[in-house]
Curated annotation (Swiss-Prot):
Bilayer-spanning residue ranges: 46-69, 135-158, 175-199, 273-291, 330-353, 369-395, 417-439, 517-535, 575-596, 643-665, 707-727
Enzyme class: oxidoreductase
InterPro entries in alphabetical order: PSI_PsaA/B (IPR001280), PSI_PsaA/B_CS (IPR020586), PSI_PsaA/B_sf (IPR036408), PSI_PsaB (IPR006244)
Name of the coding gene: psaB
Residue positions binding [4Fe-4S] cluster: 559, 568
Family from the record: Belongs to the PsaA/PsaB family.
Entry protein name: Photosystem I P700 chlorophyll a apoprotein A2
Membrane topology: Multi-pass membrane protein
Binding-site residues, chlorophyll a B3: 662, 670
Binding site for chlorophyll a B1: 654
Length: 734
């Protein structure tokens, strides 16, 4: 018999129905379940696929650089970053005739183009790129790295170059190399780039391959480093009148601790960032020499964990057994990595707008909104994935004997307490927050807005004041002008911080009130409920009182047949599936809040947010409805404008989103009947019946249909909001 897809599963390859195709796609990356898989081959396959992933990333970033260099307006933008709109790439074939051509010919281009809302122009400008030639050079270099990655992936699948399992499980060596090499050396290299290329470029000096060996980044060269006079590198920083990209008002410092923002670019001082990366580099270079490898010095992680037994005995055997549990479970390691990456990605969303690192990006409002929203959604998907792989760990890799009475086993032992506490917190937050919102709605409906319940977030305001925000009048810590910390801050550390935190032109520590208090608790409800579903899914993955043998059914099962009632919807996969809806819901509230607060801030009418955000109708009417007006006017009987593409994306997003419900609400029988009717008609229709199939068409399984429904729901949801966000922001601010 000829080899049929999927080759990795003979059982599936012999399936006579279309299930073969869908199950084949679904399990293609579940290497553990493939025929003839060994632990060694599993690790080697994953390792090789990392090279493929890197190749794709390098190719993609190379494409960004290449298209901007070829079709963009980078060199024009550099001359006037605040007034020229950055072009992402050309539009080859604008449909809908001459009005479309005119609507999309922008940014000084000769033909229709797309505007870039990704912030790459600001990023490239900040790190010292100035010409299209620079961009082409970068694109070629990344293309080379991409090819190198592909060769590396191929090489590591050859017998001679395949790493052994022992190499993959050498945790100390991997940690040392990742800490020192990945974080330490790359941070040091980045400091080098900032000091040698980016900072000179910000002062009007062009450093390239032809002159970088004879341009001193600092007038005194390496002298201060070797004589211990490091503070000389911080003397004479750029002045507050410095014009970015020119020598006017520039200084000579390379490593500073100024704090706050460059007055013209509204971004962090480049010299502060170089200093930051140098500090990070030193920390990680030291951290990467802490663990015991071939040399017999340093820490053994296993010894560290075995020693972690709390003296009071309240955590049982502490971390005993954890080293082998984690080191032998790829899912546990992936769960930890995803949890960390998810948190970092959300922090990136937060810090990219509150502490902008790139010159002039803070004044590009649409880009700010797009980047915040993008990173929060990505973070949501990554974090839910962490719990999914945590659950798979419990089902496939967890060994109760190895973990007796340690912290992991104790999590399982008192899971009822954990789950019920999370449930209580979610219920409390939900009912109280909704109660306040609805009460306020009713008061407005009755024409008595003064009877709203408006709660000032005094604790959060106190924390903001402690960091130096004076407008609340708390007079505490850094906002107390007579305190020693305040006076020291003026001269020793971050003198620019206190100015920045009290300026209204940035997004540092925004002024908050009752509307913020309410939406904060709505978001807290979403976070706690998402966490509840995910934690319950992982802790109940091995079994529950209702279904003690759950782990024998695997990660995703629909039910245990008709004879065992109540076993539907309780697989670990179902928990993940439900949690994603809550995650999307929560990030919806987060991005609505961020966007509305910033729109009113940028337009100078913060009172609109403050007054309308305290009741639900305010959100629906003054945020969603009011800001969709430009969007739904992307085209009308008189033609179209440059927002039309977002109007269509908005409609298309709704369509995809609604299609999701078709898969989520109906089950297999309906589709099976429909499929058989369609197949009957197909076989009896002339011409059509020339096309035959070998596999008998069958409906998707319950779990697959849910996945397809969830995918459409998620993609449609995000498409719809992305179009709304970009159109409403760019429509207002150009």
């Amino acid at each position: 018999m000829a080899l049929r897809f999927p080759r990795f599963s003979q059982g599936l390859a012999q399936d006579p129905t279309t299930r073969r195709i869908w199950f084949g796609i679904a399990t293609a990356h579940d290497f553990e379940s493939h025929d003839d898989i060994t632990e060694e081959r599993l690790y080697q396959n994953i390792f090789a696929s990392h090279f493929g992933q890197l190749a794709i990333i390098f190719l993609w970033t190379s494409g960004n650089l290449f298209h901007v260099a070829w079709q963009g307006n980078f060199e024009t933008w550099v001359q006037d970053p605040l007034h020229v709109r950055p072009i992402a790439h050309a539009i080859w074939d604008p449909h809908f005739g001459q009005p479309a051509v005119e609507a999309f010919t922008r940014g000084g281009a000769l033909g229709p183009v797309n505007i870039a809302y990704s912030g790459v122009y600001q990023w490239w400008y900040t790190i010292g790129l100035r010409t299209n030639e620079d961009l082409y050079t970068g694109a070629l270099f990344l293309l080379f790295l991409s090819a190198l990655s592909l060769i590396g992936g191929w090489l590591h699948l050859q017998p001679k170059w395949k790493p052994r399992v022992s190499w993959f499980k050498n945790a100390e060596s991997r940690l040392n190399h990742h800490l020192s090499g990945l974080f330490g050396v790359s941070s040091l290299a980045w400091t080098g780039h900032l000091v040698h290329v980016a900072i000179p470029a910000s002062r009007g000096e062009n450093v390239r391959w032809n002159n970088f060996l004879n341009v001193l980044p600092h007038p005194q060269g390496l002298g201060p480093l070797f004589t211990g006079q490091w503070s000389l590198y911080a003397q004479n920083p750029d002045s507050s009148s410095h014009l970015f990209g020119t020598s006017q008002g520039s200084g000579t410092a390379i490593l500073t601790l100024l704090g706050g923002f460059h007055p013209q670019t509204q971004s962090l001082w480049l010299t502060d960032m170089a200093h930051h990366h140098l500090a990070i580099a030193i920390l990680f270079l030291i951290a990467g020499h802490m663990y015991r490898t071939n040399f017999g010095i340093g820490h053994s992680i296993k010894d560290l964990l075995e020693a972690h037994i709390p003296p009071g005995g309240r955590l049982g055997r502490g971390h005993k057994g954890l080293y082998d549990t984690i080191n032998n479970s790829i899912h546990f390691q992936l769960g930890l990595a995803l949890a960390s990456l998810g948190v970092i990605t959300s922090l990136v969303a937060q810090h990219m707008y509150s502490l902008p690192a790139y010159a002039f990006i803070a004044q590009d409002f649409t880009t700010q909104a797009a980047l915040y929203t993008h990173h929060q959604y990505i973070a949501g998907f990554i974090m839910t994935g962490a719990f999914a792989h945590g659950a798979i760990f419990f089902i496939r890799d967890y060994n109760p004997e190895q973990n007796e009475d340690n912290v992991l086993a104790r999590m399982l032992d008192h899971k009822e307490a954990i789950i019920s506490h999370l449930s209580w917190a979610s219920l409390f937050l939900g009912f109280h927050t909704l109660g306040l919102y609805v009460h306020n709605d009713v008061m407005l409906a009755f024409g008595t807005p003064e009877k709203q319940i408006l709660i000032e977030p005094i604790f959060a305001q106190w924390i903001q004041s402690a960091h130096g925000k004076t407008s609340y009048g708390f007079d505490v810590l850094l906002s107390s002008t007579s305190g020693p910390a305040f006076n020291a801050g003026r001269s020793i550390w971050l003198p620019g911080w206190l100015n920045a935190i009290n300026e209204s032109s940035n997004s540092l520590f925004l002024t908050i009130g009752p509307g913020d208090f309410l939406v904060h608790h709505a978001i807290a409800l979403g976070l706690h409920t998402t966490t509840l579903i995910l934690v319950k899914g992982a802790l109940d993955a091995r079994g529950s009182k209702l279904m003690p043998d759950k782990k024998d059914f695997g990660y995703s099962f629909p039910c245990d047949g008709p004879g065992r009632g109540g076993t539907c919807d309780i697989s670990a996969w179902d928990a993940f599936y439900l949690a994603v809806f809550w995650m999307l819901n929560t990030i919806g509230w987060v991005t609505f809040y961020w966007h509305w607060k910033h729109i009113t801030l940028w337009q100078g009418n913060v009172s609109q947010f403050n007054e309308s955000s305290t009741y639900l109708m305010g959100w629906l009417r003054d945020y969603l409805w009011l800001n969709s007006s430009q969007l739904i006017n992307g085209y009308n009987p008189f033609g179209m404008n440059s927002l039309s593409v977002w109007a269509w994306m908005f409609l298309f997003g709704h369509l995809v989103w609604a299609t999701g419900f078709m898969f989520l609400i109906s089950w297999r029988g309906y589709w099976q009947e429909l499929i058989e009717t369609l197949a009957w008609a197909h076989e009896r229709t002339p011409l059509a019946n020339l096309i035959r199939w070998k596999d008998k068409p069958v409906a998707l399984s319950i779990v697959q249909a849910r996945l397809v429904g969830l995918a459409h729901f998620s993609v449609g949801y995000i498409f719809t909001y992305a179009a709304f966000l970009i159109a409403s922001t760019s429509g207002k601010f150009g």
